[in-house]
Amino acid sequence: SSMYRNLTITALLMALAIMIPIVMPLKVVIPPASYTLASHVPIFLAMFLSRKMAACVVIGSTLGFFVAGFPLVIVMRAASHMIFALMGAYYIKRHPAVLTGGLSFTAFNIVCGIIHAIGEVLACLLFYTTTSMPNIDLVYVVFVLVGGGTIIHSIVDGYIALYIYKAIPGLNPNEHIAGR
């Protein structure tokens, strides 16, 4: 049944989201900045299918970064993905044709990257205004490394996810996911 299929897809994407920060060899960590290749791909795939699925996968991803031993500020950044994931899933629900690719997906992906970066920058600012400040150039590290890096990283992962999404037959955000 479709309920079991949806549950299985959600569980698989959550498992990927948990495992990527733990086992991915291609990662750069300079707190509060971190770049783990493909870490957003399960979130994007879930976002393409359902808001509920996206929310579950963000929780899994956040857990993965926590279990992998990343600094708390990076775990908070992972939790901030809930914002762009839910907003993106909501938009896709209303405009599923964006997943056909082309300029509409490019615009969607850039906007998601900007929203994603704003969420991560806010998570860093919240963290550093409520804890002791490290000896860093806050403007450069938070706005350039985290903000700018997140936009680029998000866009790359968005395209990877779209490529995977298109390669899997039978995935359609309007047909197989009930209760979006």
What do these predicted ranges mean?
Residues S1-R180:
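Loop-helix junctions at membrane interfaces
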